[in-house]
């Protein structure tokens, strides 16, 4: 909460608000930090067979596209690290596109600000709903969260909207 309170108007971090004890670590050390939730959010394959066993978080939320290699997945599975998969966690861009192009969110007769808020709310609600479904199913079946997500949400051609 403290970090969130330091945001600047457009959401970026206000580094001037960081405490003097804030430490910038080499990029090779960020995975091994003590934390509850680890969020790889920039590059693919950053969690791999060489570093997955160093992860101390109990949950990885994949905000980047494909940040975890298949070999790392096996290590996370063995270490009981849950994964909120990228194709659910970071579906915001495609959902916003769908909302505008395919009109999956009804925004007619709304001003721009209300329309944007409605689209963001829809996107957040969808991510939360799908994540909840995955984690509830994983808890019920004992399956790895990525396996559940793939089983439940892998698209097929019938999911493609008609144009």
Question: Where are the regions a protein language model picked out?
Answer:
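Short glycine-rich anion-binding loops that position phosphate/pyrophosphate groups of nucleotides
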Residues: 43-44, 66
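Rossmann-fold NAD(P) dinucleotide-binding segment
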Residues: 25-35, 44-60
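Glycine-rich phosphate/diphosphate-binding loop of Rossmann-like nucleotide-binding domains
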Residues: 1-32
